[in-house]
Amino acid sequence: MLEHLSSLPTQMDYKGQKLAEQMFQGIILFSAIVGFIYGYVAEQFGWTVYIVMAGFAFSCLLTLPPWPIYRRHPLKWLPVQDSGSEDKKPGERKIKRHAKNN
């Protein structure tokens, strides 16, 4: 039932994370200002809360899923380097012993 979910991308690059954070904060700030002004004019604090909550839900919808806009700059990983000491089995490694101070 959940097999198709494993094929969905779940990562975001660093520039995408920055963009998502800026969008999230901007939408919240905009909805707070609009909500405050409308609530002040209508003299209903409840409308202020509703507008801010709607802005929060909208910003979550835009920023929480890893949309393709947030994956435009994938990370370039370094290639794997062969190291002689890492390929040895644990029994083949030389054990470093510290000299005892008498």
Swiss-Prot record:
Pfam families: SPC12. Expressed in the pancreas (at protein level). Keywords: Endoplasmic reticulum, Membrane, Transmembrane, Transmembrane helix. It is a multi-pass membrane protein. It is found in: Endoplasmic reticulum membrane. The chain crosses the membrane at residues 27-47, 49-69. InterPro entries: Spc1/SPCS1 (IPR009542). Residues 48 are lumenal. GO terms for biological process: protein targeting to ER; signal peptide processing. Residues 81-102 are annotated as: Disordered. Residues 1-26, 70-102 are cytoplasmic. May be phosphorylated. GO terms for cellular component: endoplasmic reticulum membrane; signal peptidase complex. Component of the signal peptidase complex (SPC) which catalyzes the cleavage of N-terminal signal sequences from nascent proteins as they are translocated into the lumen of the endoplasmic reticulum. Dispensable for SPC enzymatic activity. Component of the signal peptidase complex paralog A (SPC-A) composed of a catalytic subunit SEC11A and three accessory subunits SPCS1, SPCS2 and SPCS3. Component of the signal peptidase complex paralog C (SPC-C) composed of a catalytic subunit SEC11C and three accessory subunits SPCS1, SPCS2 and SPCS3. Within the complex, interacts with SPCS2 and SPCS3. The complex induces a local thinning of the ER membrane which is used to measure the length of the signal peptide (SP) h-region of protein substrates. This ensures the selectivity of the complex towards h-regions shorter than 18-20 amino acids. Belongs to the SPCS1 family. This is Signal peptidase complex subunit 1. It comes from Canis lupus familiaris (Dog).
